C-alpha cells in the first residue's frame, strides 16, 4: 500500500476499541465536543473536528497532492477530487519502482487540468512554413510567485488557478529511501537525496554504509544565500531556468535524467565493488569506497548545475 499525508489531517473515524489499529488520547472526543469542534451527534471524524479542511479552505481530508499521487498509482479505483475523503492508503495497480516515486516527486501536473500554465498561451509563427501556432509561453513556469499570479489574474480573472504542486521551489531537500534486504546492509539501503526544487534537481545516491558526507551537506542555505551551502549549488541554475522555462526545461530535465540513469546503472558495480573490498581489505575500506562514491557523484552534479547556471546567465544577458 501507498499512503500520502502532505501537511494535512487525513485521519477520519476512530475505533479506539480496535487497539491494534487505532491509538488516540482518552479525551480526543470530549475535547472536540467541549471546544465546539464536534456536536456529538454526527459521526466523529478526526480531520473534520481538528482541521476542518485542507490549506485551501476546502472541506476535505486531502489536497491535490494526495489525490494526484494516489490516483496516479491506483487509477482503477477511480478516485474523485470531489470526494470529501480519500483512503489513507491505496494498493497500487502495479508494483511501484523507485523511479516511479522520483517521478511523482517531480510532479507539477503538466498537461493535466491542474497545470497552472495551461492558459498562458502565445502565438508563434514558423519561420519556414509561415504558419502560426499557439504554444505555452516560454516565460510561463509552474513555480510562479504570488506577485506574478496576482498580475496575470488582474489582467484577466481566472487566468491562473493556484494549485499546490508536489515539487516546489522552496523545498530544502527531499529523499527517496530504497531498501533491499537481499543485499548487505551497507549497500542494501540507499537514500536518493535531492536539494532544492525536486522538479529540477538531481538525486544523489547515499548508501547505508557511507560514513561521511561533503561538508556542504551540513550547511543550511534556506535563510540566506551561501556559496558553501549545498542547496545553492543547484538553486542558482534552477531559479534562472524559470525565467524562460520553455527554453531551459529540456536542458534541466535532461541533466536530471542523466544522473538518475547514471546512479541506477552504476548500482551493480557499486554493490560488487563494496563486496570485493570487504572481502579483500575489510569493512572500513569498503565503506570508504561508498563514501567516496557519493562525494564524487555529488561533485559531478554540482559541476553540471554550475555550468547550466553560467549558461543561463549568458542566455539572459540582454534581460529577463
What does each model-identified segment do?
Residues 1-320:
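C-terminus-biased signal that marks the final domain/tail of proteins
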